Amino acid sequence: MYRIEVYLKSYLPDAKGLGLVRDICDLGITAVSNVRVVDIYWLDADLTGDELESICRNLLADPVTQEYQYGQDSQGSWVTNESYHVIEVAYNPGVTDPVEATIMKAVRDLNIENVKAVKTAKRYIIEGQLGKHQLEVICDRLLVNPTIQHLVKQESVIFPGNPQYSFKLERIDILKAAEAELLGIRQQFGFTNDELEAIVAYFHKRERNPSDIELETLAQTWSEHCVHKTFKGKIKFGNTTIDNLLKNTVIKATEQLDKAWCLSVFEDNAGVIDFDGRWALCFKVETHNHPSAVEPYGGAATGIGGVVRDILGTGLGAKPILNTDVFCFAPPDFPYDKVPEGILHPRRVFKGVRAGVADYSNRLGIPTSNGAILFDERYVANPLVFCGTLGLLPKELSCRGKQSPGDLIVLVGGRTGRDGMHGVTFASEQLTDESARISSSSVQIGDPIVEKKVMDILVEARDRGLYSRITDCGGGGLSSAVGEMGAETGARVWLDRVPLKYTGLSYTEIWISESQERMVLAVPPGSAEELLNLFVSNDVEASVIGEFTNDRRLQLFYQGNLVADLDMEFLHDGRPQLRAEAVWQQPDYAEPDFACPLELNEDLLRLLSSWNVCSKEWVIRQYDHEVQGTSVLKPLVGKNNDGPGDAAIIKPVLDSRKGVVVSNGINPKYGDIDPYWMAASAVDEALRQIIAVGGNLERVALLDNFGWGNTSRPDTLGALVRAAQACHDMAIAYGTPFVSGKDSLNNEFEFGGRVISIPHTLLISAASVMEDVGRAISMDFKQAGDLVYIVGITNNELGGSEYFEAHGFTGNSVPRVNAHRAKELMDRLSRAIEKGLVRACHDLSQGGLGVAVAEMALAGELGATIHLNSVPLGGPIDREDFILFSESNTRFLAEVTPECSEGFEEMMGGLQLAPIGQVANSETLEIYGLDNRRVVAISLRELKEAWQRPLRW
């Protein structure tokens, strides 16, 4: 065994190390002067000196910036003396090492065949006088996540052997089990009482006990994550009973609208709409919350990987063309001493999630072009990580495929290991301070290089017509993928034919593993050889593991033994419908009792520096949004490309002028007051952003993603009902159907007798077809002398606003939506932009008018003069701060040239709008109050500094 160390040349700055110095300083440890990071590689190999030199020189080290050394000393160490400390960190046994497969292939490409295995680690050389406790704090909070990593000590075994598995069929006695035993089984598998009773009755009729793999299959199929049993349950809400909340709200709106351009909704891995008659678009947003809480990097990376595979598995396979990401964290400056035991600090979660999404998306070659980041202390134990992907596929291939009995079940992509075990049941549960330890096998570490190869080959296989149906192997693993594909036919699987990462997996582990980068295909026997050869020729594994039948049974075999035999009808339709009661009562919060400040400079700067409003450029710059060459309007816009764009626009078909606008809406603080208006506001915000960049409402597809607490509590469930009802009402009013969605429930954390529940959170994502991308506009001011119009009504609606939050209040006047008036306003503004009457447009959201005009000014590097007494009001408001920071919905700022003002006002048809100021050839934003007294005068430099400083990491 060889140990190779690769490190930067001594005269070069270590960017990773400098970042760690800053992070260590944030912990309150100031004695660290420098950190150097060394890459460690262990090779289990029999190599000549020349071969070892070739691997180091040609593969592992960059001769321009790096040096290397090697030897046969396999031992890492924790070395410490007065001036420096050495710490090594490696992956735990069984955790996928993402670099290992790449190195193994590269070594083979060097014609070196004697490398059996590779492991990697990081060595941190920390300079400074530190005590043992300080080192432990640094390791615990920054360097080691015990879920997937460990400190390398002298006694560490680098290449532990994997035990062989000896087959033994495990049966679980449920027919004669006592009440206490049944309770244990129910808790182990996550069944409800009614569900376990149905299972007992099923096996009683068959006069046998279930095998462990049969119960695992039922637990996966009936999990909240997979079947959405709360949304599909029977809910008593007041005097009404709602039979299937999903069908009676979100899906009902889509059915009522009955848009011909909706090609596939709520039946495939993603929603599909017509793009141009030749091509179709598909869109899906998933959550990966619990895994990201336990291991942020891997959880977020596999979240992106999973939703990309959803797109690959839509219709007969789509090409991913854009990724989105929306994160909800606790504030990065959350006090360390208030972080509950068993969870990671929000700053570490934030950085890990960001890195996971960036690394996976960038390596897949998919632009990450739209997203949002929100902060609330209640996300401290349950971050929300929403990952979305937009795909493009031929319209004639947009409907879900259909296999025939006799078609082969082919597994392609990555190998199967223990990573991701029980992921869907883990995602359906409430977290505790033991979750990281108990559920460590639920975390997956993805390999984007494998997924990239799978992605490229599948498009070719699709175009050759080599398979009849496709789906991703994600949550629930083969159990979910094969179980769902075979629901209408039946399936027979030989589990010992599944390629494994290592030996020792039981038949059950093979079946429920959620190892990444895998897809399942239904392949006609006549196409199998060509398909297998195609994958092998591109260095991707493909294996025939079973066949589809015509008996509607799921039969699983291992080494010739029948280990599972379930009726598909019971598996998919035998689950008892959940019954629950929901209540909702309007809360009553204290109203603000502070006086209106005489001048509002400090308040505006404070809002620009708030975590929810401040620039997210540090995150955005680490995403590649230019790859594939389709970008039209980017996440950052303006004179220096550092202003906050409202939505992303891409041109996916290069010989067409048509584009796709992608946006989102989310504001959980409104849900504290009324989840109905929170949901309505999220829909309105997503649509506002489309209009602001030049889109329209003619062909907009919506997606819903609910992040909620424990819905077994009636008040929490009642809030969910309110939000779902608003989704229906807004979709109907705007004429914008929902095409896909996902819910993530039980986002709570229990410790020491306390429960932390996340705020009610609804993400609305939107994709709109734009007829001509040449009509796109951005939000930055363009020319001094232009008029600044406010479009829409400003009301005294600051409940849940950033301004009230900054003063320690919630309030009750939550922003509402007049959707019918809003639709007319948006339609008219859209036509005005299309006619070229608007130079710049920005929607008003968090921070209201004050933040919006400041963002337009700093992005365009042009000052402005604004008059609050010209703002159209829906009722009397006698406070300048309330007018400036109101968050009323359906409002825009529009920059219009004086020559176009008359045409603009005529186009708007007398709807509530008014010129409230002018763009100025100055470096100052000036705002005048109700009595024409100046209440804001801030330089553009101060505005930008306040806005950019918080996340200038």
State the predicted function of each range.
Residues 66-115:
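Short, solvent-exposed interaction modules
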Residues 7-16, 46-47, 88-99, 130, ...:
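Short, surface-exposed ligand-recognition loops at beta-strand->loop->(often short) alpha-helix junctions
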Residues 94-96, 115-117, 121, 137, ...:
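Glycine/proline-enriched, intrinsically flexible loops and inter-domain linkers
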Residues 1-10, 37-42, 81-93, 122-124, ...:
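Short glycine-/aliphatic-rich beta-strand segments at the starts of folded cytosolic domains
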Residues 35, 109-123, 127:
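Interaction-mediating elements
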Residues 6-10, 42-49, 89-91, 124-132, ...:
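Short beta-strand-to-loop capping motifs
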Residues 1, 12-25, 104, 885:
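Long, contiguous binding/interaction regions
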Residues 19, 23-79:
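Acidic (E/D-rich), amphipathic helical modules within compact regulatory domains
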